[in-house]
Amino acid sequence: LYPLASKRSLGKQVEFNSQSIEVIDLEEFNFNGIDFCFFSAGSKVSDQYAPIAANAGAIVIDNTSRYRYEDDIPLIVPEVNSSVLKNYKNRNIIANPNCSTIQLMVALAPIHVYSPIKKINIATYQSVSGAGRSAVELLNRQLTDVSYPEQNESPLFAHNVIPQIGDIQDNGYTLEEMKLVWETKKILGSDDIKVNATAVRVPVRVGHAEAVTIETETDMNLSLIKDLLSKAPSIQLFDDESYPMSILHGEGTDQVFVGRIRKDLSDKNSINLWIVADNIRKGAALNSIQIAETIIQSDY
């Protein structure tokens, strides 16, 4: 394992497998002989160094948005579309989806395989950790600051709900919302699926939740839906009397939790679901590791 970073991090240590490993300068690193290279340092770093690593023979798994929407680069959730991994050799780069997309795809794919999904309406309740470590530190300070909220302090995470994640685009939707649209279509392999998203930041440290309504081509009864989800990989299904919560199930867990499943009262072909997952683990780090494991096990 070679932990890479900028010169600012030289001399620091990271812990792996009960060992301390010193950080290495990314600019001077030789990627020859490296099997896998994981990029999580932002799109600019991935843009500059991922091709260098890929050209040296490393399989690059990129956790940024830099390569997600390029046609010749696979965008992978292993439980959903691992068969697409065979195309990674086009450029030796694989894209890891956005955190909110990953848990959505894990939950919806079993239904989509049985009866194709025509439309998805989603409202996300995304934790502050999705904005980075400094955002969590700001939330913690705001929660104990007696002078909060100060008028000049932004963002106002504590005791607040913020209906904007990412820059607002020309169509009025935020970048986070459009990521859900673009990535869902690519992962499920259908441009015909209609996706309507609202992404919201909530004062939770870790764990994204999503309220989702889907319309399928056929009328599916609840027993069938629950049976499909209960047999699907990486899903823990909750019964009618209980439901997943971010504070209990969205932190330190590897599964995607699904509950509050019910038929839409206004449309017989529509279903409502509540989906919770750890955005740092399944929403990022774990999914990228699963991609590497799938390549190793499948001998692509």
Where are these regions (language model features)?
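N-terminal Rossmann-like NAD(P) cofactor-binding subdomain of oxidoreductases
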Residues: 1-157, 192-194, 246, 256-257, ...
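Charged docking surfaces used in two-component/phosphorelay signaling
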Residues: 37, 128-300
